[in-house]
């Protein structure tokens, strides 16, 4: 494409050195002159957008903030679509139309930062980050979430809560069938699922998210990565400070035998009777409902699901184990797709200072701890993983945090991600349905993605 930027790389240490040196003066200035304030004499009104929150913790967080900042700032929680793709479309329509009043603070997917920043839709908050979090900004957060907020050597968001794909399994049923540990490979998962479904009369062996949407993209990527395949050179492990951060990658690698093998393994779950045919239309709530009702042995899910086990279902937390995702062959590294949400400030917000005050509040240790305990939302602050009060109380916090640090892998880091995602969603789903072969799928995607971002 005509405005494509060449790929650039820098190590985390170089990123810190360049960022710290370039912002030395900015740090002294702090947030002065970095955004507008309230209009008139009343409180500044801040509109905050996010999807539905069944845990109730988000509305409680907003209510707490409003009580503590009464007369100064008032935050309105605007509920958006629960479907990530639809939420993204709603936001981009507002950005392009210059909607008024604008959404001031966006609770956004970790993958949106580069595209929003490249289009000038969100505020560069680098000065604010260094002023309020000290020159060692990345050390305050888990490496994967803070990396997701960076683009073009700047910070565009604050990590709010984080996610990574987990394998939930019926620990009680595996033990009853003679298995002492979770599967390490997909073949082991099939073997265990086949035996447990027969022994315990469970309907399905494995449920996951295979529908034609962003969740289906995430699941397809995990199958590809865990077979040794890749999509873009920017699909890197983001927890190693000595490995490069790819600012704008453009080398397409999906058209490989390893990528095809990953999609074949995904399809084989249906062909071998481990997963139901209906999984081609499953989203998070469908797979969660099946597992929570006792109808599945294994579930590929997110950390927040742990808090739901036992609520209006037959499975309680004591029956559930948590493991990393299986791989194609024993000894291969396991990767989980980095999920989670950042807080971005609209570049057209008339109340940037007030918006920043809310962002800092919502991402502060007290609020992250509250949402971790009440909703199993994984914190982004490293210090909270040493807080035994929440680690001991919510087991998924420690296990999920370890997986994020060791196994988290980002989706393609590129300003063209929305275009790439739509192609991946359609083709991954067609492969899962058996409408195209895995080989045809990856060859098709190789050509399409080269046209978009190559």
Language-model segments: residues:
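A structural signal for short loop-to-beta-strand junctions that line the ligand-binding cleft
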Residues: 93, 101-104, 134-174, 204, ...
């Amino acid at each position: 494409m005509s405005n494509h930027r060449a790929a650039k790389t820098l190590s985390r240490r170089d990123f810190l050195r360049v960022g710290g040196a370039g912002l030395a003066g900015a740090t002294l200035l702090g947030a002065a002159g970095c955004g507008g304030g309230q209009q008139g004499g009343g409180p500044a009104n801040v509109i905050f957008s996010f999807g539905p929150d069944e845990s109730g913790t988000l509305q409680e967080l907003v209510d707490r903030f409003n009580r503590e900042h009464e007369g100064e700032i008032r935050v309105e929680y605007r509920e958006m679509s629960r479907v990530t793709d639809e939420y993204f479309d709603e936001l981009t329509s507002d950005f392009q139309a210059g909607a008024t009043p604008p959404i001031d603070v966006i609770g956004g997917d970790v993958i949106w930062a580069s595209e929003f920043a490249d289009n000038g839709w969100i505020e560069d908050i680098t000065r604010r980050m260094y002023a309020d979090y000290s020159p060692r900004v990345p050390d305050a957060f888990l490496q994967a979430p803070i990396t997701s907020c960076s683009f073009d050597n700047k910070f565009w968001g604050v990590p709010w809560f984080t996610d990574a794909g987990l394998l939930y399994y019926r620990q009680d049923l595996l033990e009853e069938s003679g298995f002492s540990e979770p599967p390490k490979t997909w073949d082991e998962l099939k073997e265990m699922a086949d035996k447990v479904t027969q022994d315990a009369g469970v309907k399905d062996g494995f449920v996951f998210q295979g529908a034609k949407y962003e969740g289906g993209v995430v699941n397809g990527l995990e199958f590809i990565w865990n077979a040794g395949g890749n999509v873009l050179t920017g699909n890197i492990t983001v927890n190693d400070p000595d490995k490069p951060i790819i600012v704008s990658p453009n080398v397409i690698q999906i058209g490989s035998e390893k990528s095809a093998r990953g999609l074949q393994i995904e399809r084989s779950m249906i062909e071998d009777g481990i997963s139901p045919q209906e999984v081609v239309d499953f989203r998070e709530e469908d797979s969660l409902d099946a597992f929570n009702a006792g109808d599945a042995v294994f579930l590929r899910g997110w950390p927040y699901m742990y808090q739901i086990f036992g609520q209006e279902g037959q499975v309680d937390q004591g029956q559930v184990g948590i493991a990393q995702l299986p791989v194609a062959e024993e000894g291969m590294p396991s990767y989980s797709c980095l999920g989670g949400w950042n807080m971005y400030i609209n570049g057209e917000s008339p109340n940037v200072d007030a918006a920043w005050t809310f962002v800092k509040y919502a991402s502060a240790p007290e609020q992250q701890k509250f949402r971790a305990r009440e909703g199993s939302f994984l914190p982004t602050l490293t210090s909270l993983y040493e807080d035994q009060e929440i680690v001991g109380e919510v087991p998924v916090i420690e296990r999920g945090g370890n997986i994020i640090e060791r196994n988290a892998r980002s989706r393609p880091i590129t300003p063209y991600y929305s275009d790439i995602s739509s192609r991946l969603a359609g083709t991954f789903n067609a492969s899962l349905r058996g409408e195209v072969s895995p080989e045809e799928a990856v060859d098709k995607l190789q050509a399409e993605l080269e046209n978009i971002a190559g």
